[in-house]
Amino acid sequence: DSQAVEIAKIAEDCGVAAVAVHGRTREQYYSGRADWDIIKAVKEAVKIPVIGNGDIFSPQDAKAMREYTGCDGLMVGRAARGNPWIFKEINEYLKTGIVPEKPSAEEVKNMILKHASMLIEYKGEYTAVREMRKHIAWYTQGLPHSAELRRRCNEIVSWESLKEVIES
């Protein structure tokens, strides 16, 4: 706790414009709860903007962190895997108090194909379609028949086979 505050003060004194604080230690990795008290202590100790990170899995979590810590911004990590809509959901909830509807299966399918297409453009087909396997698992988590879809996706080796599986 005091180490985070000390480091943030040093960064501020060196002219840093903002700091991001993760409320979890390296030793914790993903276990246990993020300690939002650390984020709050840093926010109270410095004048520069503080970005809070740790255990933001929903719009409600984002609001709770902002209210509890007073942080100026939020950083979302694991909750964005397979859920790029979370940023819009958080923004909408913070503005209106209403959580938008989850994307439809069709919207998820279209996003998977767009994501894969962009990844292929960036990394090439061979690498991209293999990397998409884990992304597809994240995108489809909790959807009906997702276990069978994930099994089939683990066999994809080309853009064509990926499209065939996703569009079927």
Feature map (PLM): residue ranges:
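Alpha/beta catalytic cores of nucleotide-metabolism and tRNA/nucleoside-modifying enzymes
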Residues: Q3-A18, Y30, D37, A41-G52, ...
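Glycine-rich, proline-tolerant flexible connector loops at the mouths of alpha/beta enzymes
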Residues: V21-S31
